[in-house]
Amino acid sequence: MGHSRRPAGGEKKSRGFGRSKAAADVGDGRQTGGKPQVKKATFESTKKKEIGVSDLTLLSKISNEAINDNLKLRFEHDEIYTYIGHVLVSVNPFQDLGIYTDNVLQSYRGKNRLEVPPHVFAVAESAYYNMKSYKDNQCVIISGESGAGKTEAAKRIMQYIASVSGGTDSSIQHTKEMVLATNPLLESFGNAKTLRNNNSSRFGKYLELEFNTNGEPVGANITNYLLEKSRVVGQITNERNFHIFYQFTKAAPQKYRDLFGIQQPQSYLYTSRSKCYDVPGVDDSAEFRDTLNAMNVIGMTEGEQDDVFRMLAAILWIGNVQFAEDDSGNAVITDQSVVDYVAYLLEVDAAQVNKAFTIRVMETARGGRRGSVYEVPLNTVQALAVRDALAKAIYFNLFDWIVQRVNASLTARGEVANSIGILDIYGFEIFEKNSFEQLCINYVNEKLQQIFIQLTLKAEQDEYAREQIQWTPIKYFDNKVVCSLIEDKRPPGVFAALNDACATAHADSSAADNTFVGRLNFLSQNPNFENRQGQFIVKHYAGDVSYAVAGMTDKNKDQLLKDLLNLVGTSGNQFVHTLFPEQVNQDDKRRPPTASDKIKASANDLVATLMKAQPSYIRTIKPNDNKAPKEYNVGNVLHQIKYLGLQENVRIRRAGFAYRQTFDKFVERFYLLSPKTSYAGDYTWTGDAESGARQILKDTSIPAEEYQMGITKVFVKTPETLFALEAMRDRYWHNMAIRIQRAWRNYLRYRTECAIRIQRFWRRTTGGLEFIKLRDQGHQLLNGRKERRRMSLLGSRRFLGDYIGVGNKGGPGEMVRNGAGISGSEDILFSCRGEVLVSKFGRSSKPAPRILVLTNRHVYIIAQNLVNNQLVISSERTIPIGAIKAVSASNLKDDWFSIVVGSPQEPDPLVNCVFKTEFFTHLNNTLHGQLNLKIADHIEYNKKPGKLATVKVVKDPAVARDDSYKSGTIHTGPGEPANSVSKPTPRPKQVSARPVTKGKLLRPGGPGGGPSKLAARPTPAAQPLPRATPQPAAPQPAARAVPQPVAAVAASHTRTGSTASVRAPPPPPPAAAPAPKKPTAKVLYDFNSQQSNELSIKAGEIVQIVSKEGNGWWLCMNMTTSAQGWTPEAYLEEQVAPTPKPAPPPPPPAAPRSTPAPATNGAAAAAKAKPAPPAPPAKRPNMAARKAVPTPPPAPRDSAVSMNSHDSSGGSGRGTPNSMSNASLAGGLAEALRARQHAMQGKQDDDDDW
C-alpha cells in the first residue's frame, strides 16, 4: 500500500476513500487508467519522508502501546491524522497547522485515500463520492471526549462538501452559504468555555445535508440533542456561560443597550459567577459580528433578531433578581426595580412576576374532584430555584426556536435524492462531580459506541460467517450490556429507577433522591454497576464514572411550574407565546415525560437515523488536558486508545476485507471491464450474476488471493484492488470518449484540409492580382518608349512597393521612418535603396547611397551618415508630391532618372533605382495619372537651381550588367525591346498528391475516397550507410552524438554477402579544413620607392597582396618586415593557390603512392631572361588619405537588401567601394561611409564647372 507524503510547507493533501453498501470501505478508485502511467523519474526535493505509518494496519506489532507510539511520533511532526483502514484517527493539535486552506482542499478533489496523506477532507470526499456514485445516504460519526476536536472536524467536513458539491444556480449557492452560516450561529448559542475546551459543544447536533440527483445541495435539516441548560444559571470557576451572553454584553449596539439595558458581563450574576469573562485568543466582539452576519444569511428579520436579544436580556436580568428572608423565613425580593425591568422585557405584569417568584399555588384534590387552592410562600432556596427554572426554560426554548428557524430557512428547494449526515455531539465526560447531565451525555456516547461496534466489528464478523468466508474471529468488548443497564425497563435500568422515584415521591426532592437510591439496590447484581453511599458507579466503555444522586430526581422531572407557565401565558409579547406554545391543562393527571424519557427517545431516534445511512468514522483524541500545542500526555492518550477500541479495530481490519458487494450490484458496476459481459456499453452476459462476477474478476486479472466469493456477495480484500477496478471502469469511458473525439477531430481535420486546399487553389489562381495589375500599369506608363531589363520581365515579378518595410512596426524600416521623421499618418507606397548623384566643391560628381521613400504626400531621399561613430539617419531631401513637375528618364535600359522640381534653392535629384518602373507607377497613381514622364536619349535635370543640364546615356555592349556613371555620361548595356511585356506567371512545381487525412476512422482520400495510396506504398528496405568521402570542410564545432536513423541502425546489424566474412573498416574522419590563405604575388622586377607611401621590392620576393586598385597599383605587405606600401601592378605576378587533391578512398589502399613532378622555378627563369621592367603608372593612391579595404567580388543587384547587407551601395553595385563587411547596422554603414570619404580624396572633378 503506497502512501504519498505531505509537501513541504505544512500543507497536507488527502484523498477520498469510499465504502460499500455493507458498511465496508468502498474506494472511489479515481485514477488515470487501468494501466499505470509511467513517468520519467525525477528527484523530488520537496517530498517529505513519511513519519511513522499513515495507516495503523501497517504496524509490524499490533498493541495499544505501538499505536500510541506511532500517534505520538506523528503528532510531534504535525501529522495529526492517521488511518485504520477507512476509519480516521485525529489528534487535536491545539494550533493552526495551515492544513485547511483552499489549495489543500482542492488537492483532495477526485483523489482516493491511497494517493495523498490522511486528512479529514478525505472522509468528506469519500462520503460525497459514494453518495453520488452509489446513491446511498451517508453519515459521518465523530466521536471522542470533550476537547478532542469533534466540532472542528464537523466544520471542516461542511467546508469541503460546500466547496466541491458544485452548482452554479443562485439558490444552490445560497443554500451553501446558509449551511456554513449555521456554524457560527449555533456555536454562539450552544458552545461554551470549559476547563478542557475553550469551544466545547454543550449540545448535540446532527446536521443532515440534502442533495439532488446531481449531487448539488438543495437543503439541510438540523436535529439538536441535550442542550446543557443548567449552564445558563451557574458555572464552575474558570468556565463561562454560553458564548452569546459575552458577545452580546461586550459588543451589543447602542440600540440594544438603550432598549434592553445591556451592560458589561460583570454586571450580571449569570455571567460573573465564575469570574471568567474572556477566552484566550477569542475576540467576542468579532464573534458577535459573525453571529449577526449568520442571522442575516439564514434570513432572520430584524424583528426576529430583536425578539431573540430581548429574551437574552430578560435572562440576564432574571439572574439579577435577589431574595432575602422576612421575619417569617419567607423569601422577599430585595430590589423591586429589577423585577419591574424583567416584567418590561417579558411584557407581563410586575406583580405577577413578584408572585410567581415568591409564592407557589398548590391545589388539593379529593375523589378525582378539584379541591382547595392554597398559596404557599417560598423560602429563599425555593425562590432561587424558581427564578433559575424560568431562565433555563426561556433559554432552552429559545435555542429550540433558533434551530427550527434555521431548519425553516434550509428547507429543501427541490427534490431530495440523498443526504450526508454529520454528527457532532459532546463526547464522553468524567468530572470530579458527575450528575444527571453527565449520565445522559455518557449514555448517548455508549449508544454511538454500540453503533460503531455493530457496524465495524460485530456486523463484519457476522457477515463473514453468514457468507461462509474464511475468517479468524477476533474477540472484542460489546457494550450493549452497559446500554441495557441504563435504558432497559425490564429488568429496570437506571432511567426506569429514576422515573419510578420521581413518580413515587414527587413532592419532596430529598425523599425522591432517597427512593432512587433504594431502587438502585436492585441493580447491584449487574457486573457493570456499583451502588455506594449517595452515589453509584457505571462501568462505561470509556472508564468507570461515579454519579452523585443528589438533585437527580429534580433534574429528571424537567417540568416548569404551572405558576411560571401561567406567568408567560399572560405576556403581551407574541414571541414569548411562540417560545411557550403549550397551554396549561389543569385537569391533566398523566405523568409528563421526564428528561430521561426524552433523551432515551432522542438517542434511539438518532441510532435509527444513523443505521439507515452508510457511516464513516472519525475518532478524535485529546493529547492533553491543558489545551497546549506540542504537549502529548502518553497516559491520557493510551487510556483513550483503549476505550475507543482502536486495537481491536486494527486487528479486524488486518484480517478482513476492504469491500464487499452483492453479485448483481458488482456486475452492474463493473460489467464494462470484461469483453464477455459487455459489448459497446451493453450488458451481454447470459449467465447468472455470480458467474458474471467471476468472469469480470478473471478478465481483469485480479489474483485469486485478492478476493473471495460468498453466498450472495463478492469480497475484495484490499482497497488497492477496488481502486484498480474503479480506475479501469473510468478508463473505459475515457477510451470511449477518446474514440468519439478522434473521429470528430478527424472529420474536422478533413473538412479543414479541404477548405485549405480550395483556398490554396483560389489564391494561386487569383493571388497577387493587384500586384500584377500594378505591374501592367507600369508597362502602359512606359508605352514602349524604354528598353527593359530582362529581370524586370520575369513572370514572378510583382510590384510589392515597400521593400524596406518602412511602413512596418519594428525592424530597420521603423528606424528609417523615425530617423527621417516621416509622419505616422502618411501611407508608405514605395521604399527602396538606390543612389543619388552628389556634387561637392572641388570634386567630381559621384553616386552616393540613399534610401528612396514615396508616400501619399512626399518623396523622401534619406541619407545615412556617421557622426561620432554613431549612425545618424536623416531626411536629406523632402519633396512634396505636388511640387514634382516631371520625371526624366532615358530610352535605354539604365536605371537612372531625375525628379524635376525646378526649386530655386536646390538642384533636382538624379536618382539611380533598380525599381524605377515601379516608382513611376506608384508616383503616377498618387498624382491621379498626371505624371509627366519624359523619355528621351538623354536625361534632363537642374544640376543647379535654374541651370538645366543633360546627362548622356550611351549603349555600351562592354557593360555586362550594371550601369556606370562617369563625367556626365551613363554607360549601360543593351536591353530587351521597348515593347516587351512581362512573361506569364510560371506554374508552380508539381507535387505528388497528398491524402486529405490520415488515420483509420476516415480513409485518406476523404469520407468517400478510394483506397489509401499510403497503405499500398511499399516500405523501403533498410540500406547500409554509404561510405563517407573525405573532403575539405569548414571548421566545425565540437562533435556531439547524433542519433542514427532506425533503418541505418537496422542495416548495420544485417549480414549481407559482401560483409559476412570481412568486416568493413570504419570510414576515416573528414580532413581538417585548411586555413584560408591570403593572396600573394611574386615580384618580377625591382622597384625602388619614390614616395613614403610606396614599397620597395626586389625581383623574386613574395609579397602579400592587401588590396588591389583598378588604376594599376596594388597595396602590398613585405612578409618579412611587415612594411606596407603601394607597388605597380605590372611588377607583380599573383600566385594562384593550387587546388587540393581529394583525399584517397578508404582502405584497402592497393595503389602505390605516386611521386609528384618537380616544380619549375619560375623566378629563376625570369631572372635569367632579365626583361626590361615596365614604367609604373602615373597616378598613385594617396596612402595617407586612404585606408586599405579588401575588395570582394561584385554583388548582385538588390535594392531591398537589409541594413546589415555587405553591399554598401544599397544594392546598385556601382560607384561606391564595397566596405560593409561588419555584421552590425552601425558598423557596416559607418565603414562604408568612411571608405567612400577616403576614395573621394585626391580626385579631380573632371566635369565640375565651379
UniProtKB/Swiss-Prot annotation:
**Does the keyword section mention Hydrolase?**
yes
Residue spans of biased composition, Pro residues class = 1021-1035, 1064-1077, 1139-1151
Which SUPFAM superfamilies does the annotation name? Answer: P-loop containing nucleoside triphosphate hydrolases (SSF52540), SH3-domain (SSF50044)
Residue list for modification Phosphoserine:
372
Question: After translation, how is this protein modified?
Answer: Phosphorylation of the TEDS site (Ser-372) is required for the polarization of the actin cytoskeleton. Phosphorylation probably activates the myosin-I ATPase activity.
Query: Composition bias, kind Low complexity: at what positions?
Result: 1036-1051, 1152-1170, 1223-1232
GO CC terms: actin cortical patch; cell cortex of cell tip; mating projection tip; medial cortex; myosin I complex; plasma membrane raft; prospore membrane
GO molecular function list: actin filament binding; Arp2/3 complex binding; ATP binding; hydrolase activity; microfilament motor activity
Ranges for domain SH3 come to 1076-1137
Q: Which Pfam families would you find in this protein's record? A: Myo1_CA, Myosin_head, Myosin_TH1, SH3_1
Record's domain comment?
The myosin motor domain displays actin-stimulated ATPase activity and generates a mechanochemical force. The tail domain participates in molecular interactions that specify the role of the motor domain. It is composed of several tail homology (TH) domains, namely a putative phospholipid-binding myosin tail domain (also named TH1), an Ala- and Pro-rich domain (TH2), followed by an SH3 domain and a C-terminal acidic domain (TH3).
Q: What does this protein do?
A: Type-I myosin implicated in the organization of the actin cytoskeleton. Required for proper actin cytoskeleton polarization. At the cell cortex, assembles in patch-like structures together with proteins from the actin-polymerizing machinery and promotes actin assembly. Functions as actin nucleation-promoting factor (NPF) for the Arp2/3 complex. Plays an important role in polarized growth, spore germination, hyphal morphogenesis, and septal wall formation.
Its family remark reads:
Belongs to the TRAFAC class myosin-kinesin ATPase superfamily. Myosin family.
Record protein name field: Myosin-1
Originating species: Neosartorya fischeri (strain ATCC 1020 / DSM 3700 / CBS 544.65 / FGSC A1164 / JCM 1740 / NRRL 181 / WB 181) (Aspergillus fischerianus)
Upper lineage is:
Eukaryota, Fungi, Dikarya, Ascomycota, Pezizomycotina
